[in-house]
Structure formats: structure tokens, C-alpha cells
């Protein structure tokens, strides 16, 4: 995922990856992580996801990282949240009492920002990367997370040749092969969601599975 590609998607508002509702797997499985209310939760490539509002409603401190400035601004305006903006190194920091979003490149995000994080949530980050860049992102995510951090990973899998991503197909095999060095992995669920995704139906994608994993940083 090149920065120019991502910025153009947001500029043209071609954001079919943005969900209008809170992710059902997040609602169903988040409590399984057993986190106290004041937990700091890292959300990589957060966009303007409503899932961050859900996490804040659980009492968590949400720390997001997003490349595109418009996405960050729309998150606060769409949810009618007053925010303060400051500059932190190469990143712009937008924050309210419970939500802090760092606008900029996740590969240059200082580790000091996530040093107190004990949980993370990845629904749209791993699947945003083409396979050629995905492993690099996975290593960067691991490097930002303190040992013992727990998280919920949500992926999509489908025949990649049937559709040009993003979102890109991430198979259970890929997850095991590329994440198991840094994380303990537990499969929570895997289900057919093709009927709920008209874009995939329109492109004649034959099947579409959404999976949820519980990850623990080693």
C-alpha cells in the first residue's frame, strides 16, 4: 500500500473498506480479552472507524495511527468530538480525553507512544497491505507492542485473483506462518460473510470468510 494510493482513496472518498457499523466480531469477542476499563488500546491504520468509539465506551484509552489527515479529521467531525491538535515529531496528534490519533506513517511512529499499551485491535490494517508489504507491517506492529499485550485481529480471506484489493485476502495459513514468531494465536471464529458484502458479490467472488483471532505478544 503506497501512501499516494491511500491518500487518493480518501480524497476520492472511495472508502468501501469503512464500515458503517461496529464490527460484530469486536462486539462479540472483545470481552474475551478480559481487560480492565482503563486499558490503553492501540488501533493501527484506524481510519475513521466507529470501532474506536466502541472501545472508548468500554472505558479504554484509544491510541490510533492513521496515514491520511482527512480520515482523522472526519472521525472527529462525524462523531461531533472536539479535539486538540499538536505536533509530535513527524506526526500530528489529535486527541480528546479518551481518544488520541496520530496522523502519519506507522513505520515512523515512536515506540514511546505505545509503551504503556496492553491491548490492540486490528480489523482493517493487516488486510490493507498487499502480500509484498504485509509481513513488514506485521513486524512493525509487533515492535510497537509491549510483551504480554493482547489483541483482537480480524481478517478477510477469499480467492485473491477474483478481486483487486484492498482489502486483501489473508488466509489462516498466512497468519500462522507470519505472526506465530511474535504472537501466541488462538482462532476465535471463522464464518462466511459473502452475503453481507455486495461489492464482493458484484465482482463474482465465489466465497468470502471473515475470521477473528486472539493474539498475545510474546
Swiss-Prot record:
Q: Which GO terms describe its biological process?
A: methylation; response to metal ion
Could you say which residues form the signal peptide?
Answer: none
Q: Which family does it belong to?
A: Belongs to the class I-like SAM-binding methyltransferase superfamily. TPMT family.
Write down the NCBIfam families for this protein, in alphabetical order: PRK13255.1 (NF009732), TMPT_Se_Te (TIGR03840)
Q: Where in the cell is it found?
A: Cytoplasm
Task: Report the enzyme's class at the first EC level.
Answer: transferase
Q: Which InterPro entries match?
A: SAM-dependent_MTases_sf, Thiopur_S-MeTfrase_Se/Te_detox, Thiopurine_S-MeTrfase, TPMT
Enumerate the catalysed reactions: S-adenosyl-L-methionine + a thiopurine = S-adenosyl-L-homocysteine + a thiopurine S-methylether
Where does the source fall among the domains of life? Bacteria
GO cellular component term of the entry, any: cytoplasm
EC no.? 2.1.1.67
Q: Which UniProt keywords apply?
A: Cytoplasm, Methyltransferase, S-adenosyl-L-methionine, Transferase
Q: Which PANTHER family match?
A: THIOPURINE S-METHYLTRANSFERASE
Q: Is Plastid there in the keyword field?
A: no
Q: Which positions bind S-adenosyl-L-methionine?
A: 10, 45, 66, 123
The protein depicted here goes by the name: Thiopurine S-methyltransferase
Asked if Heme is a keyword of the record, the answer is no
Q: What is its main location?
A: cytoplasm
Q: Which GO terms describe its molecular function?
A: thiopurine S-methyltransferase activity
Amino acid at each position: 500500500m503506497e501512501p499516494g494510493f491511500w491518500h487518493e482513496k480518501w480524497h476520492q472518498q472511495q472508502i468501501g473498506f469503512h464500515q458503517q457499523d461496529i464490527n460484530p466480531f469486536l462486539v462479540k469477542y472483545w470481552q474475551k480479552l478480559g481487560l480492565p476499563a482503563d486499558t490503553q488500546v492501540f488501533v493501527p491504520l484506524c481510519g475513521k472507524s466507529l470501532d474506536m468509539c466502541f472501545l472508548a465506551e468500554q472505558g479504554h484509552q484509544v491510541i490510533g495511527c492513521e496515514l491520511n489527515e482527512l480520515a482523522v479529521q472526519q472521525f472527529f467531525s462525524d462523531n461531533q468530538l472536539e479535539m486538540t491538535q499538536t505536533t509530535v515529531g513527524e506526526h500530528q496528534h489529535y486527541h480528546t480525553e479518551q481518544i488520541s490519533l496520530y496522523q502519519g506513517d506507522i513505520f515512523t511512529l515512536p515506540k514511546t507512544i505505545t509503551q504503556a499499551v496492553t491491548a490492540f485491535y486490528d480489523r482493517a490494517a493487516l488486510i490493507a497491505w498487499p502480500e509484498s508489504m504485509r509481513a513488514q507491517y506485521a513486524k512493525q506492529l509487533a515492535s510497537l507492542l509491549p510483551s504480554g499485550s493482547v489483541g483482537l485481529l480480524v481478517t478477510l480471506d477469499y480467492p485473491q485473483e477474483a478481486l483487486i484489493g484492498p482489502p486483501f485476502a489473508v488466509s489462516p495459513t498466512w497468519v500462522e506462518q507470519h505472526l506465530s514468531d511474535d504472537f501466541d494465536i488462538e482462532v476465535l471464529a471463522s464464518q462466511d460473510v459473502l452475503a453481507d458484502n455486495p461489492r464482493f458479490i458484484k465482482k463474482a467472488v465465489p466465497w468470502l470468510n471473515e475470521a477473528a483471532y486472539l493474539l498475545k505478544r510474546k
